[in-house]
Amino acid sequence: MGLEYHCPICGLSVSEMKDYDRKRGRNNCQCWKCGSLERHRFTYLFLQMYLGFFKDKRKNILHIAPEKCLYEVFKDYRLYVTANIFENRITKELFDITAIPHKDSCFDLIYCSHVLEHVDDDIQALREFKRTLKPGGRGRGHIVLDLPVRKDLDVTYEDFSLQTAEERKKAFGQEDHVRAYGKDIIDRIRSAGLTVENYYPSELFTPAEMKYYGLTDERLFLCR
């Protein structure tokens, strides 16, 4: 069997990827070497091929809830802030993203993947991203968001009266989620004062390329 899959982050080529979560049908999707999943590989390719982000390391990055595979990509940039609400080996700062302790207009890139669905006031978090992002012009910054969006929901569903893990899992699909995003996600992001575009892997890559890189058709949101 040939080397059918390639991780663009670490460069590993293999005949089959690692299973991640068999209970949810997440088979053949994780890189054996760097641990990347489909969304991480798409983010890397999007930054590389469509934003040209890796051409200059004199940039400031805010990475929320950092993933190890992308930490290795960003760690040598001029300023690289990794942030979370709990400590781990690759987190530099502990803070609530609804009150980011950094000055206005300081980041070239803010990357936040699968975090906002855990945050009570996601709109305020988006406002903080906008505040700390470098403004328009040639050197303008970018916010890259990755969010789980349910195709069966027209309107985002949240209910803060649900407090137990069991209630939240039933309502939102995961014990620590506080909402399920729906088809109104673009309007929700815009309500924080941001412009937003969304990009699907299938719009940017051929089916053969998507298979080669191990991608699913989960979109990214590019905001400013």
List each model region and its residues.
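Activation segment
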Residues: 89, 101-104, 119-123
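Hydrophobic adenine-recognition pocket in adenosine-nucleotide-binding enzymes
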Residues: 112-115, 148-149
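Surface-exposed loop/turn positions
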Residues: 59, 106, 137-141
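S-adenosyl-L-methionine-dependent methyltransferase catalytic module, highlighting the catalytic core
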Residues: 5, 120-224
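Conserved N-terminal segment of class I S-adenosyl-L-methionine
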Residues: 1-101, 200-222
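Hydrophobic beta-strand segment of the Class I
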Residues: 64, 107-111
